[in-house]
Amino acid sequence: GFRVTPIAAAVATALYSAPTLYAQETSGQSVGLEEIIVTSRKRTESVMDIPASIQALTSEDLKAMNARGLSDYSRFIPSLNVITYGVGSSVVVFRGANVDSGGYVAQSTSSVYLDELSLSNTGEQPSVRMVDIERVEALSGPQGTLYGSDAQAGTMRIITNKPVMNELDIVTDFSARDGSQGESSHDASIVLNLPLIDDTLALRLVGFNAKDGGYIDNIFGHTPDTDSGGAWIPSGFGTLDNAHAVEDDWNGSTIDGWRAALRWDINEDWSTTFTALGQSVDSGALNAYDPFAGDLKVVKFDEEFRKDDYDMYSFVVEGDLGFAQLVSATSYFDRTVKTHRDNTAYNHQWAQNYCGVYESDPSYYPYYYAAADGSGVVWWPVYCMAPTINGDYLSA
């Protein structure tokens, strides 16, 4: 015979009543999709009008997901993956196309832009703290025409909020968190929009400080006394301990940064924006543990750290030529990364490799872009990019 179970009755009731509830909630209201304006093709247009694969996250989206870095919002973009081993150490991957992420001199297959400033670099891309960000645009597939040789697999664009004319505004934010397995953490930021000359000049200042508490312990242990790999072992190899390096929560990190943008509206058709920013990342060990040592524990024999400091400067000119819109961007990017990792527990003798201290001084010089859009049908880009990269790699 037929018998109605409590679960079946509950499901049937929910399915029957759901349309009625929906009709009551939406009665008298219009339902539509939110229009997102992007500039991925170097002109302002709706994301729905672009015949390409692009995902955009607005500032409201980023706030809702509490995004602080690349790895926080990458999971919401289907074609994007971020490989990260710690703060300030990330590799952006589109559609699974990637080079050796462990090589510091490997050329990236995906480019990262902060406004009109290219952050693409050999090895790992620098971390961008998500403070005062207008939106994030992710372009999947080759983008070399507009974003250079690094954009073979895709391009990530991080767009900051620009200075606003005739509006004095200050925004502060602070949050703290704690857990049973590690140190406490906090995020603090301040944003100041300052009008200098009515309808002509405005300044926007951003400052932030963040601490991510460590949660991995380096516990006491000895070096292995057997040679599983067949390499030569120094005398007394099995008698060394790590008493001098024992530390709790040793993978913590701190981030300090600032950004300043000065916008000058020359007239209705021409404007310039000068942007300067700096960020310093001081982090401990990698976010990795050894399950043989215990949960969230490792046995290391020397301190581990990563220091990542960079400064950026950008000058952008935008104007109407009558027959086309012109965007000229000149930028400079200086970055120094120092990394110290312990390899004591490895039985093989390591030859010199691209490790230790990594210093890079990449400079990006002007590119120009013009687009004609008279009838809305004919549109052509004229694009020129002239990058110069100088890098010094020191091994130890």
Where are the model-predicted features located?
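Outer-membrane beta-barrel domain signature, strongest for Gram-negative TonB-dependent receptors
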Residues: 239-396
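Extracytoplasmic beta-strand/coil segments of soluble accessory domains associated
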Residues: 39, 71, 75-117
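N-terminal periplasmic accessory domains that precede
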Residues: 70, 91-93, 113, 126, ...
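Outer-envelope beta-barrel architecture signal
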Residues: 46, 90, 108-110, 166-170, ...
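Transmembrane beta-barrel wall of Gram-negative outer-membrane proteins
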Residues: 171, 180-283, 311
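Non-catalytic regulatory/gating segments with a bias toward low-complexity or hydrophobic composition
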Residues: 54, 62, 74, 136-141, ...
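N-terminal Sec signal peptide and the immediately downstream disordered periplasmic leader
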Residues: 1-65, 71-76, 268, 272
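Short acidic/polar hinge/loop motifs at secondary-structure boundaries
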Residues: 102-103, 109-110, 115-142, 190, ...
